[in-house]
């Protein structure tokens, strides 16, 4: 697996931007109306109603590269979620890429928040690894892509092998996931806590828990920016017109990651809102697809 982003990857993605007539930026209502094909299978990874993943598998024989999708919605049930991600899942399957579309317990569900939401990320990836042979999934070729709150979670996934051993979230055996696409993500819980409060009306304690004698630093096992360097390759793709997670957020995180020694690049999506970032029908999608295919080593394969 390459250890750095190809220098041409972002440039190629920018060239994929559709020129000519530009559609109006998508609204929240446009986003909530998104849908896509039915999954190949729905697989529970825990007993709670929200502890499951949807598998979308291309036709034919594998092994297939995998994209793990983690939806956003401000960590709450109020703003859609896994259903909207089906539109992207369908577009990826058409490229010969399998998709593991993750649902998880959110802060306003029993067991959600800290530590439950993060435990669900562990369990969902364990389930992917367990089911990979049955469905011919190549978990050595894997990208985790998350939108908004899901961006925070996939960036956390990249660093979970650096969790303190004293953390309730620590695990000693993990599926490595080091190729990350964060779409309008809000990953730096400490430095973006005011923005998270403004954009999502989330108190940081819901996402990071309360300090205690055994865990005085609530960010040590929740904040992606505290878990670098971790050997990840991250593209932070943000709509030019994103007001939920403005481009500054991506630039600030990329600067920290690169200073720490990780590979991180910013991709600004021209004319795109926060919701265009996760719509396969948007002008932005072609740029994002170039990044995903490049991370999976498919850049020289015919684009379908």
Each model region followed by its residue ranges:
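N-terminal cap/lid segment of alpha/beta-hydrolase-fold proteins
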Residues: 24-61
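Mobile cap/lid helix-loop segments that gate and shape the active-site cleft of serine hydrolases
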Residues: 27-32, 38, 48, 159, ...
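Short amphipathic alpha-helix adjacent to the substrate-entry channel of hydrolases
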Residues: 81-100
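Primarily recognizes the serine-hydrolase "nucleophile elbow" in alpha/beta-hydrolase
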Residues: 126-194
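Short beta-strand/loop motif that positions the catalytic acidic residue
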Residues: 236-238, 242
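Conserved alpha/beta-hydrolase "acid-adjacent" motif
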Residues: 243-249
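Catalytic histidine-centered segment of alpha/beta-hydrolase-like enzymes
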Residues: 272-282
């Amino acid at each position: 697996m390459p250890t750095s982003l190809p220098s041409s990857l972002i440039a190629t993605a920018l060239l994929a931007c559709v020129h000519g007539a530009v559609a109006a930026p998508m609204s929240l209502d446009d986003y909530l109306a998104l849908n896509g094909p039915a999954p190949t299978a729905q697989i529970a990874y825990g007993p709670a109603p929200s502890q499951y993943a949807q598998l979308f598998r291309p036709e034919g024989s594998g092994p297939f590269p995998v994209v793990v999708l983690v939806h956003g919605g401000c960590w709450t049930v109020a703003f859609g979620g896994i259903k909207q991600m089906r539109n992207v899942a369908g577009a990826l399957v058409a490229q010969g890429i399998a998709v593991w579309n993750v649902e998880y317990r959110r802060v306003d569900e029993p067991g959600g928040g800290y530590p439950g939401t993060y435990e669900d990320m562990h369990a969902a990836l364990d389930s992917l690894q367990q089911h990979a042979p049955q469905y011919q999934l190549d978990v050595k070729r894997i990208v985790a892509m998350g939108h908004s709150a899901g961006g925070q979670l996939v960036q956390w996934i990249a660093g979970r092998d650096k969790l303190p051993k004293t953390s309730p979230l620590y695990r000693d055996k993990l599926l490595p996931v080091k190729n990350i696409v964060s779409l309008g993500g809000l990953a730096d819980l400490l430095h973006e806590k005011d923005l998270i409060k403004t954009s999502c009306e989330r108190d940081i304690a819901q996402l990071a828990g309360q300090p205690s004698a055994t865990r005085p630093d609530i960010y040590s096992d929740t904040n992606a920016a505290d878990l670098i360097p971790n050997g990840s390759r991250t593209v932070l793709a943000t709509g030019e017109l994103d007001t939920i997670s403005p481009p500054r957020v991506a630039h600030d995180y990329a600067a920290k990651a690169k200073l720490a020694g990780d590979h991180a690049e910013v991709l600004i999506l021209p004319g795109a809102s926060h919701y265009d970032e996760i719509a396969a029908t948007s002008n932005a999608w072609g740029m994002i697809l170039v990044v995903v295919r490049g991370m999976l080593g498919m850049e020289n394969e015919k684009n379908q």
